[in-house]
Amino acid sequence: QDEKRPRTAFTGDQLARLKREFSENKYLTEQRRTCLAKELNLNESQIKIWFQNKRAKMKKASGVKNQLALQLMAQGLYNHSSSSSSSSSSSSSIFLLA
């Protein structure tokens, strides 16, 4: 059974460096990721995931919706909004688009 790796607690210095790098480039080359990992004493996957998460967070904060998502929402087939509505009995449905 595979155990999940514990959550990485980045230091303030590591976060500051990652944020500075992100402000210059939203995407890293493999070479840049390798250098950053060595510089910050992290492994490359930690750097990669941090950048992926940061891009996703920015995309979500921008409020820009994907065109396909808008079409599916109009058809009532898609709603991934994080509203605070509580439904005690939620049912799952699978839709196949032909």
From Swiss-Prot:
Q: Where is the composition biased (Low complexity)?
A: 81-98
- What SUPFAM superfamilies does this protein's entry cite? Homeodomain-like (SSF46689)
Note the Pfam families from the entry.
Engrail_1_C_sig (PF10525), Homeodomain (PF00046)
Report the GO terms under cellular component.
nucleus
Q: Where is this gene product found?
A: Nucleus
Q: Which UniProt keywords apply?
A: Developmental protein, DNA-binding, Homeobox, Nucleus, Segmentation polarity protein
In this entry, the residue ranges of the DNA-binding region are 3-62
- What does the record list as GO biological process? neuron differentiation; segment polarity determination
Domain of life assignment: Eukaryota
| GO function term, MF aspect, one | DNA-binding transcription factor activity, RNA polymerase II-specific
InterPro entries, per the entry: Engrailed_Homeobox_TFs, HD, HD_engrailed, HD_metazoa, Homeobox-engrailed_C-terminal, Homeobox-engrailed_CS, Homeobox_CS, Homeodomain-like_sf
Modification after translation is described as:
Phosphorylated in the Ser-rich domain.
Region span, Disordered? 79-98
Q: Which family does the UniProt entry place this protein in?
A: Belongs to the engrailed homeobox family.
Question: PANTHER family attached here?
Answer: HOMEOBOX PROTEIN ENGRAILED (PTHR24341), HOMEOBOX PROTEIN INVECTED (PTHR24341:SF6)
Q: What does this protein do?
A: This protein specifies the body segmentation pattern.
Q: What is this protein called?
A: Homeobox protein Ht-En
